[in-house]
UniProtKB/Swiss-Prot annotation:
Organism the protein comes from: Sinorhizobium fredii (strain NBRC 101917 / NGR234)
Taxonomic superkingdom: Bacteria
Keywords: Hydrolase, Plasmid
The protein's name: Uncharacterized hydrolase/peptidase y4tM
SUPFAM superfamilies per the UniProt record, alphabetical: Creatinase/aminopeptidase, Creatinase/prolidase N-terminal domain
C-alpha cells in the first residue's frame, strides 16, 4: 500500500527543478535533511526526524536515496514514491550512540552511489542538521568539498502547484473552525487550557470530508498582560474580565498550513483600543490591496508602513513570511519575508501569512491574513472576518 498525495509527474517536476538549481551551484550530491523538503520531494511523512534522516539527491543519478532509521523503513515504503531499493535503512547501533553516528552510514552510501562526487551540498541552517551531523560528514568525506545549500529546496517550494493550493485551502477551512471554537469557548472564568482543548479538537476533527493534523506549533495564546508577547503558550489560569486575548493558530492538512491570528476583547474595549484595532485592520487591507504579481515583498510592507505612519505607529518586526508545507518547529518556509529590503518578486502561487500584529509596551493586537498570490491579486486562505472580536 502506498499513500501519496501528489502524482508521480509532480514529484518528477519538483526533482527536476532541484537538480537544475544543483547544477547552477555546481553541486554533485545534495543531502536534504529538512523534513518538509524530504516530504516535498518524495512524500515521506513520519514523526521520525528526531533521529538522523536524509534524502540524497544525485546530479547524475535519476532517483534519490532515502536514508533513515531501520524501524522507520516501513514509513518510507508506505508514504514515498521511491522503489524499495532506494530506501536504505541504517541499523539501530547508530541511534543516540556516543561513538557512532548515522552520518558515517550516509557517507558510505553516498560514496557507493557517487564515488566521483566532488561537491556535496548540505542544508547548513536546517533545524535538524546539527553541528555534529556536519562534523561527522566532514570526517567521513575528507575528499569532497562541502557547499552550503541552505534553502535550495525551500526556494523550489516557494511557488505552489494547484494541488498544493487546494490543500492549503482545506487547511484554511480547518483554521476557520479552530478560531470559531476558540471564540465560542473563551470567556471570563474559563481556563486558558480549556480554550486550547477546544482548538485542538477542531484542529484534529477537521471537516466532514477531511481531517486535520497537528500543526508545527501549539496555538500561541496571550491572555491579559501576556497579549504583549508574540509567542506565549497557554496556561491553566482563568481568563479575566476586561482583558485581551491574542490567538494565533493554524489548521494543518497533509502538512500544509494556513495560519491566522485574531484578538478577542472580554468586556467593553476603551475607544483607544478600538482605534488601534481600526488602524491595524486598515493597514492590513491596504497591504492586501498592494498584492499582485510583480510587486516585491518590500512593496507590500511599504503599503503597511504608509498606512500605520499616518497614526504615528511603526512596526519594527517583519510583516509576514512565506508559508506552505511545514514541520515542527515553524510553519514558515524561511524564504521570503514581507519586510524592508526583501526584494523577492511576487508570482502567482506564492503563499504568505500577512502578520498584522503589534506587541506594544502595555498591550498587543493581532489581526492577520494568509493568502495566495493570483494572476490579478490575491486569494485569502481563510474567510474569517478581519475584525476585533468583542465578547461583552
Amino acid at each position: 500500500m502506498r499513500i501519496l498525495h501528489f502524482s508521480d509527474a509532480e514529484y518528477q517536476q519538483r526533482m527536476l527543478r532541484v537538480k537544475q538549481r544543483m547544477q547552477a551551484q555546481d553541486i554533485d550530491v545534495l543531502i536534504v535533511t529538512e523534513p518538509a523538503n524530504i516530504n516535498y520531494l518524495t512524500g515521506y511523512d513520519a514523526w521520525s526526524f528526531y533521529t538522523v534522516q536524509a534524502l540524497l539527491v544525485f546530479q547524475d543519478v535519476d532517483l534519490p536515496m532515502w536514508i533513515g532509521r531501520s524501524i522507520d523503513k516501513q514509513s518510507a515504503i508506505v508514504t514515498t514514491n521511491l522503489p524499495d531499493e532506494r530506501i536504505i535503512p541504517y541499523p539501530d547501533i547508530y541511534v543516540h550512540s556516543p561513538d557512532r553516528h548515522a552520518a558515517q552510514f550516509i557517507a558510505q552510501m553516498l560514496l557507493r552511489e557517487a564515488p566521483r562526487a566532488k561537491t556535496v551540498g548540505v542544508e547548513m541552517g536546517a533545524y535538524y542538521y546539527t553541528a555534529r551531523d556536519h562534523a561527522e560528514l566532514q570526517k567521513a568525506l575528507p575528499n569532497v568539498a562541502f557547499k552550503d545549500a541552505e534553502l535550495l529546496v525551500n526556494w523550489v517550494r516557494f511557488i505552489k502547484s494547484e494541488r498544493e493550493i487546494a490543500y492549503m485551502r482545506e487547511a484554511g477551512v480547518i483554521t476557520e473552525r479552530m478560531m470559531k471554537r476558540a471564540v465560542e469557548v473563551a470567556a471570563p472564568g474559563v481556563r486558558q487550557c480549556d480554550v486550547a482543548a477546544a482548538i485542538y479538537h477542531a484542529q484534529m476533527s477537521g471537516t466532514e470530508n477531511y481531517g486535520g493534523l497537528p500543526a508545527t506549533s501549539p496555538p500561541h495564546m496571550g491572555f491579559g498582560e501576556r497579549a504583549r508577547e508574540p509567542h506565549p503558550i497557554f496556561t491553566d489560569r482563568r481568563i479575566d474580565t476586561n482583558s485581551v486575548a491574542n490567538i494565533e493558530l493554524s489548521g494543518c492538512r497533509l502538512r500544509y498550513h494556513a495560519p491566522m491570528s485574531r484578538t478577542v476583547y472580554f468586556g467593553r474595549p476603551p475607544q483607544s483600543y478600538r482605534d488601534l484595532a481600526s488602524y491595524v485592520i486598515e493597514a492590513v487591507e491596504t497591504s492586501l490591496d498592494a498584492v499582485r504579481p510583480g510587486v516585491t515583498c518590500e512593496g507590500i510592507e511599504l503599503a503597511w508602513r504608509k498606512s500605520m505612519s499616518a497614526h504615528g505607529i511603526e512596526k519594527e518586526n517583519r510583516l509576514g513570511y512565506s508559508i506552505g508545507i511545514a514541520y515542527t518547529p515553524t510553519w514558515g518556509e524561511r524564504t521570503a519575508s514581507i519586510r524592508r529590503t526583501d526584494l523577492t518578486v511576487l508570482e502567482p502561487g506564492a503563499a504568505f501569512h500577512l502578520m498584522g500584529g503589534l506587541w506594544l509596551a502595555n498591550t498587543g493586537i493581532t489581526i492577520t491574513q494568509s493568502f495566495v498570490v493570483t494572476a490579478t491579486g490575491h486569494e485569502p486562505l481563510t474567510a474569517t472576518p478581519r475584525e476585533l472580536v468583542v465578547k461583552d
